[in-house]
């Protein structure tokens, strides 16, 4: 990646010319699994920007400082001056990416709203053209869930059980960890 703050005095970088050569700014929201009608702002998230030209590509942990997201390492990230369409992947909670994949896990007990929100894994992946796709100069990231649905049909002696009569249910033997291949066109957790 390139950073104008790291250029030597008098140095010239032709990729820093043009209207698109400006600092990346973010507007980020996520819908928590515990309340599909609410929006939240994660305290941190993983951000991967892949530029097909190889320059101005980033893989960062973003943290919320005040009302702005910044790279945890303090690097100023820029769009390239050409306005190149890039692939952006954003996910929360943050975890290190290993070989293009991120480990995902969920707590075994999700009985309360806080336990349920601890199970959140939200993701957004798509193409962004900095010349046309920014709103107020910011990249808009609306992180959504990779949903997993477990359907349990309860029977007692072969007859269906009315679920309103079930006060509590425990299911054992489920795998609570997986990996999400962020390099896939449509990432899924397996």
Feature-to-residue mapping (PLM):
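Sec-type signal peptide cleavage vicinity
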Residues: 1-190
